[in-house]
Amino acid sequence: MDFSKGHGTENDFVVLPDPDVRIDLSAPRVAALCDRRRGLGADGILRVAKAGALAAAGVLAELPDGTSEDDWFMDYRNADGSIAEMCGNGVRVFAHYLRSTGLETRDEFVVGSRAGGKPVIVHSADGSAGEVTVDMGVVRDLGTSAATIDGKVFNGIGIDVGNPHLACVDAHLTAASLSALDLTAAPGFDPGFFPHGVNVEILTRIDSGAVDMRVHERGVGETRSCGTGTVAAATAALRFDGADSGEVKVRIPGGQVTVALSGGRATLRGPSVLVASGNLDDSWWNGLS
């Protein structure tokens, strides 16, 4: 079984081309493949197939809004095997993979996701490095809530970017004090507010057009970056300063991306890196439940 490995600001993925939708992505198999000791290691899996093929195979009950049968669809799975609606870094890597392998020849096209079709612009793409802008669509305010991180309570805003986020801006945080926080344990949150779990971002306020952010992703743990999380963070940071539009550079442990918000919609621009390709041993894969 062929695979590629890539990352967007060190949020890393195993890419599995599966045009005929024959790969059984059971939760235990996904978890084993993403395990950094017994598998390839990754924050998630990106299955590459056309939306129509996934619908015909029963993976999708229906085509999400803005997605046609002929669109390439990012079937995304978290490291624990759970299905996720959307992954901004994943879309960049997915689009880069399509262009670098020749599966897609256009620089502008739509990537399907469970959160709807996501138009992308591939600014550059070769066998290893790419730069991609993703139209992340509508950003929705869910109201205020709070997270408990490292024994401290941080107030934040619930934000829907195709998946749920709780973005907490703290005016007293510096890059150094943010780095010192312990995100080993999952942050506490209100399960009544977020019944299906939530991705939690903690960040500094805007300074010279930029913020520093860390993220704990549901089903994964702390990651080096989270694309939808950077959009949520930029949204929360702008609102903290009384604005609802603007451009914010978001610095995460894995690098930097640029988020632009206007009219309630967001775009995300950042790098993608393809680092390896190879073949999974069939006996190992088939031996997994």
UniProtKB/Swiss-Prot annotation:
It catalyses: (2S,6S)-2,6-diaminopimelate = meso-2,6-diaminopimelate. Keywords: Amino-acid biosynthesis, Cytoplasm, Isomerase, Lysine biosynthesis. GO terms for cellular component: cytosol. One of its GO terms (biological process) is lysine biosynthetic process via diaminopimelate. It is an enzyme of class 5 (isomerase). Pathway: Amino-acid biosynthesis; L-lysine biosynthesis via DAP pathway; DL-2,6-diaminopimelate from LL-2,6-diaminopimelate: step 1/1. The keyword Secreted does not apply. Pfam families: DAP_epimerase (PF01678). PANTHER family: DIAMINOPIMELATE EPIMERASE, DIAMINOPIMELATE EPIMERASE, CHLOROPLASTIC. Catalyzes the stereoinversion of LL-2,6-diaminopimelate (L,L-DAP) to meso-diaminopimelate (meso-DAP), a precursor of L-lysine and an essential component of the bacterial peptidoglycan. Homodimer. This is Diaminopimelate epimerase. It comes from Rhodococcus opacus (strain B4).
